């Protein structure tokens, strides 16, 4: 599914923002976390110097791998490596990303910015989209933002990609689905982009799908504590992975969908990378263990044959080895679940009534908790649509309204 996810999630956002739209890397090492994870929803302790260095650009280049035939004529792009913070430990992290600017002259106040959070691609260093000519499927979505007059600040997330000057071994692990780190990486990408391209405005909207939807939402929640110096106007989350703890019950009962089964090794390895109490052998069996390298890889030749594995999946391949192992996994995923904090930033959540990756009831329960906290959320359920959905003109109009200063409305 991860291979399909790349195309799917690019397609979601490519379709969603257009008003006229119609319907070989080795596996991440296990148990490499420094200690058992004790995840807190609060801000981590961050050293004064590291706090001041957020968004600092280590390097940037206008010599990029991107396919400019997919972008509006006259657009510009830079890759960048910048500093951010781990949401788990508060330690500094080095992250790769990119900034794209539309053709022409910026409007007064600078180009409005889309902080773009990509969807699930994987958990290994070969999964950094900004090393790929088509951003692993996101290039069309970026092009649409540029055509609408927005600059795009794009993050790979810590642990995905190989930042210049750092070895693969020194690169941080990607804490898949951990919301604070991803939120910090996105906010710091906007900071870094404004350094690389001074013509960018401080005003921005967060946008993402699936894992990126969770990231956009988390950026809104932690913006008050972390986002100083920029002006986040709203966060648009498509099919967001707000709370994936329900995967555990499905794994126990051997009822994971095919899409969820593709996702499952990334969930396990992403947790194991930061928590030594997660033993991957407790969760990955059969095809999921034997072909894990293929399932985790993002690029050929390592990823070749990923789609064909679906016919070999057995429900028991993902079943936790004990009730204790199941409870441990459930606890970790519950600790990651959004909402984590109330937010004053307006939120848009669009999700599919037939989603086979993130069932709509999971999304609705999470949004209910956020509504109870007093968040302003516009909740849109698209009946008959799945993890790849088409919200038509709604998304683009909602984003335009945020930049125009139109008061946001919710339907909690």
Features from the language model and the residues they span:
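Short, surface-exposed "cap/lid" segments of acyl-processing enzymes
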Residues: 87-96, 100-148
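Primarily recognizes the serine-hydrolase "nucleophile elbow" in alpha/beta-hydrolase
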Residues: 191-259
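C-terminal catalytic histidine-bearing segment of alpha/beta-hydrolase fold enzymes
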Residues: 330-331, 357, 361-412
């Amino acid at each position: 599914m991860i291979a399909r996810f790349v195309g799917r999630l690019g397609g979601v956002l490519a379709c969603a923002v257009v008003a006229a739209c119609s319907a070989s890397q080795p596996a991440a090492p296990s148990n490499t976390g420094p200690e058992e994870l004790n995840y807190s929803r609060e801000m981590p302790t961050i050293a004064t110097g590291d706090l001041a260095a957020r968004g600092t650009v280590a390097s940037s280049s206008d010599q990029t791998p991107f396919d400019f035939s997919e972008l509006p004529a006259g657009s510009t792009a830079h890759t960048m490596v910048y500093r951010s913070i781990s949401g788990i430990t508060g330690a500094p992290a080095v992250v790769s990303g990119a900034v794209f600017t539309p053709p022409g002259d910026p409007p007064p106040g600078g180009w409005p910015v889309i902080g773009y959070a990509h969807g699930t691609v994987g958990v290994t260093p070969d999964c950094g989209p900004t090393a790929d000519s088509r951003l692993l499927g996101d290039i069309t979505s970026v092009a649409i933002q540029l055509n609408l007059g927005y600059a795009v600040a794009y993050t790979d997330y810590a642990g995905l990609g190989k930042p210049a000057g750092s070895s693969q071994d020194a690169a941080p692990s990607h804490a898949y689905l951990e919301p604070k780190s991803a939120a910090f990486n996105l906010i710091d990408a906007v900071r870094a982009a404004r350094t690389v391209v001074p013509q960018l405005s401080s005003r921005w909207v967060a946008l993402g799908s699936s894992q990126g939807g969770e990231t956009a939402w988390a950026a809104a929640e932690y913006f008050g504590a972390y986002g100083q110096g920029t002006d986040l106007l709203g966060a648009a989350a498509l099919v967001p992975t707000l709370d994936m703890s329900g995967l555990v019950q499905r794994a126990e009962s051997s009822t994971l969908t095919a899409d969820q089964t593709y996702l499952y090794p990334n969930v396990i390895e992403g947790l194991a990378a930061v928590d030594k109490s997660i033993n991957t052998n407790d969760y990955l069996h059969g095809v999921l263990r034997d072909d894990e390298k293929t399932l985790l890889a993002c690029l050929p030749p390592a990823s070749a044959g990923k789609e064909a594995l679906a016919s070999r999946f057995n429900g028991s391949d993902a079943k936790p080895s004990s009730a204790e192992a199941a409870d441990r996994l459930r606890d970790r995923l519950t600790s990651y679940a959004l909402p984590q904090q109330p937010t004053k930033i307006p939120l848009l959540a669009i999700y599919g009534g037939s989603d086979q990756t993130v069932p709509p009831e999971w999304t609705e329960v999470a949004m209910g908790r956020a509504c109870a906290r007093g968040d302003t959320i516009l909740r849109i359920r698209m009946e008959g649509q799945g993890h790849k959905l088409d919200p038509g003109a709604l998304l683009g109009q909602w984003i335009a309204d945020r930049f125009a200063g139109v008061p946001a409305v919710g339907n909690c």
